[in-house]
UniProtKB/Swiss-Prot annotation:
It is a multi-pass membrane protein. The keyword Ligase does not apply. Keywords: Cell membrane, Membrane, Transmembrane, Transmembrane helix. This is Uncharacterized protein AF_1268. It comes from Archaeoglobus fulgidus (strain ATCC 49558 / DSM 4304 / JCM 9628 / NBRC 100126 / VC-16). GO terms for cellular component: plasma membrane. The chain crosses the membrane at residues 4-21, 34-56, 79-101, 122-144, 148-170.
Amino acid sequence: MVSAISTVLYVLIPFLVFLFRRIDARAIMVSGIAFYPFHLFLPMIVVFITGIPLILKSKGVYITLDGIGMENPDFSDALLVIDTMLFQIMLLQPFITLIYSRGVDLKIQDVRLILGTPLRRRILSSLFAFVIAGIALPEIVLLNFSGILHVDYLFFVHLIASSVFANLLVPSDSSKTSLVVFYLWVYIS
């Protein structure tokens, strides 16, 4: 269910944005890993590394040097946890691309895309992130209250807020600085 929703949203959202013409939809469409400059892919690694242990711990899964242990022997729960984390990453991926590719030239099929950096566009992209969060959270909250999955969805909100923080407060011509701020914000908090 989670995988199906994430797939639909990942395909549908760029076209909805394109229709409203508020954000450069091409910038979202090119957020596939194959087109990532390496430093744009790093935030995904950070999200995965920092998020998976937190969510697994909330489910009673613990990782030791000897392997993976579980207080609950139903390993399918752990797989559902990981699937949900991947779902969150897929939702965050387009928005993080918008943030960390500011001022970076992307070449796809010899088409040069330079993302705009005005404050107005950055504010719009931040609002877009909250729209994504509004779509994702009900699914995660539903899993919590139904007892299917106990996941710390506040961590997901925290990642959105971190991205918005880096997007609005860091100079628009410094994507590397944005990346450093994102790392610090996630690890410190």
